[in-house]
Amino acid sequence: MFLNEKVGAVIVAAGQSRRMGGQDKIFARLSGKPVLAHTLSVFQQSPEIDDIALVVSEHNLKKAKELVKEYNFSKVIAICSGGELRQDSVSSGLTALCDCGWVLIHDGARPLLDPVSIPEGLEAAKLCGSAVAAVPLKDTVKEISPEGLVEKTLPREKLISVQTPQVFRADIIQKAYRRVGITATDDAQLVEKLKLPVKIFSGAYANIKITTPEDLLMAEILLKKGR
C-alpha cells in the first residue's frame, strides 16, 4: 500500500532473448535460481507491493506458472501472455492490475534491483505522478550519421541512462497507453508525449539488464559481492 492505495507491479519478461546464445534469459540460472525468480523475489518481499502481474511470452506461460508455484510467489495474481511489442506486454499487465492506484513497471531481466528502489520510486512519483530510475552516464556519447560518421558530441552532464522500475499513478500510465500512438522504448516516453512531468530518482549501476551471456556473468559477480 502507498497513500492508502494498492500498489501493483508489472514484471515484463516477454522478450525474445536474441542475444543470449540460444538460452532464454529469464530462465537462465543465476546463483542456482532462474533470473526471473530473483526479480520476482524482490517484489514478493517488498511490503509496499500488493499485487504482481507477470507478463511472459506465450511459449513460456507453462514454465512461468511452474516457477511461481515452486517459489510460492503469492503476490502474483496474473500471468499474462505478452504481445509483439513491449507496449503490448505492459498493457496486458496493466489490465490485470485494474484496481491498483499505483503501478511499478520493471524488466524481468533486471534481477539485481535494490529493494529500497521501490519505496524511493513511489515517493518520487508522489510529487508529480510519474518517476523513473536512472543513473548518470559514465561514457562520452556521440551522435552519428547513417553512414557511421560522428556528427556531434552530446553534453554528458545533461544525459542520463534510464532503468526500471518506472513508477506511475495508475490513471496516468493507463491514459498514456490509451492515447499515445507511438512505439516507445520505455513507458515514461508515453507519459512525456502527454506533456506530463516525469521525476528522476536514483537507480544503481548494479541494476543491470541481462541481455547477453556476458551480462549474466557480471550479475553472478555482483550477486556474490552483495551488489
UniProtKB/Swiss-Prot annotation:
It comes from the Bacteria. Pfam families: IspD. The record marks R156, K209 as: Positions MEP for the nucleophilic attack. It catalyses: 2-C-methyl-D-erythritol 4-phosphate + CTP + H(+) = 4-CDP-2-C-methyl-D-erythritol + diphosphate. The record marks R19, K25 as: Transition state stabilizer. One of its GO terms (biological process) is isopentenyl diphosphate biosynthetic process, methylerythritol 4-phosphate pathway. Pathway: Isoprenoid biosynthesis; isopentenyl diphosphate biosynthesis via DXP pathway; isopentenyl diphosphate from 1-deoxy-D-xylulose 5-phosphate: step 2/6. Its EC number is 2.7.7.60. One of its GO terms (molecular function) is 2-C-methyl-D-erythritol 4-phosphate cytidylyltransferase activity. Keywords: Isoprene biosynthesis, Nucleotidyltransferase, Transferase. The keyword Transferase applies. The keyword rRNA-binding does not apply. Belongs to the IspD/TarI cytidylyltransferase family. IspD subfamily. Catalyzes the formation of 4-diphosphocytidyl-2-C-methyl-D-erythritol from CTP and 2-C-methyl-D-erythritol 4-phosphate (MEP). HAMAP family: IspD. This is 2-C-methyl-D-erythritol 4-phosphate cytidylyltransferase. It comes from Dehalococcoides mccartyi (strain ATCC BAA-2266 / KCTC 15142 / 195) (Dehalococcoides ethenogenes (strain 195)). The lineage of its organism: Bacteria, Bacillati, Chloroflexota, Dehalococcoidia, Dehalococcoidales. The gene is ispD.
